[in-house]
Design a protein with these regions (language model features):
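Acidic helix N-cap motif at the loop->helix transition within catalytic regions
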Residues: 69, 120-123
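Conserved redox-active cysteine motifs that mediate thiol-disulfide chemistry
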Residues: 81-98
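N-terminal targeting signals for export/organelle localization
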Residues: 1-59, 189
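A short beta-strand-turn-helix
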Residues: 55-77
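Thiol/disulfide oxidoreductase modules built on the thioredoxin-like
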Residues: 124-132, 137-188
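Short pre-active-site segment immediately N-terminal to redox-active cysteine/selenocysteine motifs
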Residues: 75-77, 82-85, 151
Length: 189
């Protein structure tokens, strides 16, 4: 083997390229885990389950003053945290809008909370998906802290009693709506 080939082999087997390769492989593994764990997960371990839901007052996205979860006392509320740049949020928006009339007829509502987003982008998102349910804006992330939000979307089902009845991390599905929301609507509608 010539000295050029031997030098290349020595450089490839030196610790630095091996460390870089190990780092890249670890990053790929973490990314894969993150994508796999971004699937919808009902959160039976949420620290808020069966507790009274926090009710921070936030500005309405449409500019019509402020509101909070307290304004929906006695209703079943699907409290959905989202952002316009969140791909899973884009995927679930049509489903949430499709369920809104059913919720309204039975004394409930979807209540969207746009978090850490550019206001113009959030408004464009609402227009694009034709969202008609109320949306509040958490520009600095305070309310997401109260709910322990880890990623978007994250959704909480608030019963008529103001307590968190269910939670889901990731996209809401029709199955989740049927199993976790409809029974609450039927209880005393």
């Amino acid at each position: 083997m010539n000295t050029l080939g031997l030098g290349l082999v020595k450089r490839l087997l030196s610790p630095i390229p091996l460390i870089v390769l190990a780092g890249v492989l670890a990053l790929v593994a973490l990314l894969g885990y993150g994508l796999a764990s971004n699937k919808t997960k009902e959160s039976s371990t949420s620290t808020l389950l069966n507790k009274v839901a926090p009710t921070p007052e936030l500005p309405k996205l449409d500019g019509g003053g402020k509101s909070s979860l307290a304004a929906y006392k006695g209703k079943v509320v699907l409290l959905n945290y989202w952002a316009s740049w969140c791909e899973p949020c884009r995927q679930e928006a049509p489903l949430l809008q499709r369920w809104q009339p059913t919720l309204e007829k039975a004394g409930g509502t979807v209540l969207g909370i746009d978090v850490l987003d550019v206001e113009g982008d959030a408004r464009a998102f609402v227009r694009k998906y034709g969202l008609t349910y109320p949306i509040l804006r958490d520009g600095n992330g305070d309310s997401q802290t109260a709910y322990g939000i880890l990623a978007y979307p994250e959704t909480f089902v608030i019963g008529r009693n103001g307590r968190v009845a269910a939670a889901v991390r990731g996209e809401v599905t029709d199955k989740f709506m049927r199993q976790s929301v409809l029974p609450l609507l039927e209880k005393s509608s």
